[in-house]
Structures are given as structure tokens and as C-alpha cells.
């Protein structure tokens, strides 16, 4: 199979906005509502955003073949990454790296005011640090031809062969210019095009899918459409994985293929923006509910710090909960253990079964909500 020579951006022919108008309006409206919620002062990153960012990391990684669930990642965090399963440990590292990479990217875009090739390389370096792809030149664009196919496939029977390495620089520079120096009529349409173009270029030896999906909220954040790079779209892509790949693969010189991809993308954006709005509302309601419940159970002015800690680490060991609460107040481990016993007796948290020491505890209401 010959390498795919992607079209340079922007397109010479305009996109048929009449055809996609309804979907675009609906998706834009949902994103606007989501951003309005993100701008509220009571939407705390640590309490409400980080749990869903972890879920996005899990789902984006699952599209690439990881198996770990969000609950398993939370358990591994409580165990500080200790596990007898190499696969689980590798999944844990990949997902942890994803979280670090998106937070780093947000700060860099805010600081530098652009999405540069330098930034993409640094995101890639963070993503692959100590992970399965650590031998795939983390932080470096590929210097040889790659291809996509089933395990063991060759370039001759590959399902897709990206841009040749000798053309990589010109395509990446074209993409960088399109991201930073060009404005489509709609930023959502531009995000859809950027995602496809990045995947068609496939500039890294590994990690292209995750970075390509990360680029979607990052671009909307850069353009000011989102006040934070929060548009957890991987859930929709994972649920519709076959269609996601079919639509990506169908994009070529054909205008129809592009339009079908854009329609699919706008459906994903609208669906996930609405889901995220509902999820944030449920998280806020749960937080308000348990502020009252835990205050009544513990009967102490420290209860608010306990609630905050449970939202930050919904699966924990007593020492970790003590460490988290101690970031806000001076408190001894004995007092924290007393709080834990009361919360277990009240059914607010559930202890790990079958262990007498170093027990993990689960704030099940929150775990179930974000899972």
C-alpha cells in the first residue's frame, strides 16, 4: 500500500455548511452551556473536573487497547501503583501519564498562547514516559515510515499508511499554521479537521490516537470556546469505536467522506457536552448532599475537609486520607481513623473485603457516579 498524501490545509473548497447547519448549531449550543458551567466559581478542578479527566484518560486509552477500568485505576492510585499484574501496572502508567499531559498542555497553552509542534513533542514525551511506548522515541517525530494494521501486518497489507517521513515536516508545519493562523467559520469544524489531519499524518511511532483526541478540547480551549480544555469526547468514540474508525478511514479527497466525518464529530460533541453537563450537576448535587450528611455524622467543623478529601481520592487508605486532609488543617492520624470508623458505620464509605490491614476504603457513591 502506498502512503496517503493528505490534503494540505485549509481546504480549497468550502465546506457545505447548509448540510451540517442543524448539527453545528446543536453542538455549539451544548458546548456553550458546558463552558458556562465550567466558568462557575464553584466548579473546583480537584473536586469535580479531575475525576472526569481520569475517566477521559481511561476511555481514550481503552480505544488504544488498555483494559483497566476507572475503579481499577483509583485502586492502583490508593496502592501507589503496586500490583502483581504487569498489564495493570502498564495501564496505570499510561493513564496517569495522560492526566499529566493534559494538565501540562493546558498550562503551556495558557502561558505560550499557541499550540506548537514543540508542545506536541513535549505532550508525547510525557505520555510515553515509562509506559509501553517508552522505546518509541518519546518526544520525537518519526524518522521512518509507519503503518496501521493488524498485529504482524506489513506495509503491503496495512489498513492505512500515513504521510511519508520525507514529507512529514511540511505537513506538520502546515497543520501548525492551520491551528494557529487560520480561522474556519466554526471552531468545532476546525477541531474536527485538525483531529483527522493529525491522525492522517500520524507523526509519532506511538500515541498518535491519544494525542489526536487530546487536541480536540485543547484546540477549543486555545480558541476560547472552552474556558478549560474539558470536552470528554472519548466516551462517545469508545461507544461507537467501529464507526469512529470507519469515518476516519473514509476521509480522503472525497468531500462526502469529510462531511460524514464532520457530522459524526458534531454528534459526538453534542452528546458528550450534554453528558458532561449532567455529570457536573450530579457531582455538585452529591457534594452538597454529603456535606450535610458527613457534617451530621462527624459533628465537627473538620467535616468539610473530610468531604473534600473524599471527592479528591474516592478510593483510599487511611494514611492517604490523613495526608489529604492534612493539606488543609493540622490533624492527627488517630482522629482521621476515628472519622473513618464513623463513616463506615454510617455506610458512607465501604471497606475492602477480605483484608485486616492496609485496607482500602471506597466512597461508593462517587465511584459509581464517575464510573
What residue spans do the PLM features occupy?
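FIC/Doc superfamily catalytic core
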Residues: 1-371
